[in-house]
Amino acid sequence: MYQPTGFANTIFAQRYAINAEETFEEACQRVANHIAVAENGSREKWAERFTEVMVNNKFIPGGRIWYGSGRMKGQLLNCFVVPTEDSREGWGKTVSDMLIISGTGGGVGINFSPLRPRGTPIRGTGGEA
């Protein structure tokens, strides 16, 4: 079984362990249990498989996955692209989604492609974009 030493252990303990007592093997089990939910079939079987390859250093997930797995507000991805609809409600939902994602550590990009061009008439208000 792989056990991080020296600088690798320092980084693991400071950034990825849930607390000072969590060992590398326990962290592997935590991450494996979290990501096994996405697999078809027995969650326990997949968690065992993931744990085995991780503790033997055959597969090491990205840092965000280590950090976010098993935490209440953890993100497993660094970046998100948020769609937006061309309406007041759509803009509000986009801002709300952006705040939630940013608040849990994710980066946000917004797709403005669906928005109408400047000068386009707005139905119901008589205004223009």
Residue ranges and their predicted role:
Residues 1-129:
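Extended catalytic cores of very large enzyme megasubunits
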